Structures are given as C-alpha cells and as structure tokens.
C-alpha cells in the first residue's frame, strides 16, 4: 500500500507523516504532530499539535485527537471518538494546562467514545462505542457505559475471552488476567457488603 494525502487535507509543514500513510478528505494535522507509518487517517479527523500516533493505526472519520495524546502502534480509533486534554475547561483560561493521555499498543476505541484526559488505556484494551472513560483501563479489558466500567476481557484479536480467559477464536489464553478478574470481583463484593 502506498500512502496518499487528499488535496483537501490540511497538513502543517511542521507535522511528520510516516511512509505509506493515507490522509483523507478535509482531515487536519497540526504543527508538531507525528503520525507513524502505514496509518489511515479518515475524513474530517482532527489531529492537534504535538499529538503522537504510532505505526499501523486507523483513525476513523471525525475522530478528534487533542494535544497531549500519545497513541501506540496498531491502535484503532472509531468515528467521532474524542480525547480531551483539560481537566477544567473554560472558553478563556489563563491557567490552561494540557494533561497527557496515553493509548497503548493494540487498543481499540469505539465509535463516539469520549476519553477524559490524564488516563492510560493499556495494551489491547477495548472501549465500547459511546463509552465515557473516566479511569485508567487495564490491559485486555472491555469497558462500556457512562462512566465506563470493566464488563469483560478481550483477546489481542479483539474477541471476548471466556471465564478461563481463553479466546474461542484463536485459542490463546491469558492466565495473568484471571488474577485481575478475581481481584476485581473481591473488591466489588466488599463494596456491596453492607453488614
């Protein structure tokens, strides 16, 4: 695949675009942004100044990636997903401070999800469509809802894991996730114990 930049895309001369990356209609990439190799940036996507996007990423139409965001390799960002960067937003604010956010390798952010700033979404985690992420997301976790909560676990291929933390699709198992699952269940049981 060879990359292409659509003539309507607005790319800052100070942005770095990796080899074989495609940028589609009316996308905007600001100064100091770095986009890796073999990425696909969808129509009307907005990539703010100094945002870092790794290799082999797919940023869908109308996704909004604000300053302070670092995205690893092979990350999927769905259409209309939004990453914020200010804890106390105001139209005019002399003390505006960018709060960094990180998405690790292989994670997926669903359509129309909102990720608040200052968080880390760990490797191969999956954020469901429409979720509002207000806390860090563990590796391989499937989070959904408003606010987003862990509702399951996923394989590197994105498919759900069973109770034994095994993927029915490719047979991979993740025994390290069993420990996390048990710890989460114990803390949840303590929180609901009213005795």
Label the model's feature ranges.
Residues 3-144, 149-150:
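Structural signal for interior beta-strand "rungs" in well-ordered beta-sheet cores
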Residues 143, 161-166:
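Assembly/interface hotspot detector across virion components, adhesins/toxins, and nucleic-acid enzymes
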Residues 150-153, 165:
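Cys/His-enriched microdomains
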Residues 157-158, 169-171:
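Short Cys/His-rich metal-coordination motifs, predominantly Zn2+-binding knuckles/fingers
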Residues 162-164, 174-177:
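Short, non-ligating residues that shape and space the ligands of small metal-coordination modules
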Residues 193-195:
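Short, low-complexity, charge-dense intrinsically disordered segments
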């Amino acid at each position: 695949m060879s990359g292409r930049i659509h003539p309507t895309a607005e790319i800052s001369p100070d942005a770095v675009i990796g080899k074989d990356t495609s940028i589609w209609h009316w996308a905007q990439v600001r100064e100091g942004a770095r986009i890796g190799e073999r990425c696909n940036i969808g129509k009307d996507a907005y990539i703010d100044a100094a945002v870092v996007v790794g290799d082999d990423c797919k940023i869908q139409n109308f996704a909004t990636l604000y300053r302070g965001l670092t995205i690893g390799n092979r990350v999927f960002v769905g259409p209309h997903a939004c990453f914020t960067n200010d804890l106390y937003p105001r139209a005019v604010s002399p003390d505006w401070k960018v709060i960094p956010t990180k998405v690790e390798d292989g994670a997926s952010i669903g359509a129309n999800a909102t990720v608040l700033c200052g968080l880390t979404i760990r490797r191969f985690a999956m954020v469901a469509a429409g979720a509002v992420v207000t806390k860090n997301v563990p590796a391989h976790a499937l989070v959904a809802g408003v606010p987003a909560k862990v509702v399951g676990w996923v394989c590197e291929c994105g498919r759900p894991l069973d109770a034994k933390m095994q993927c029915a699709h490719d047979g991979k198992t993740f025994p390290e996730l069993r420990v996390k699952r048990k710890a989460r269940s114990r803390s949840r049981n303590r929180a609901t114990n009213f005795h």
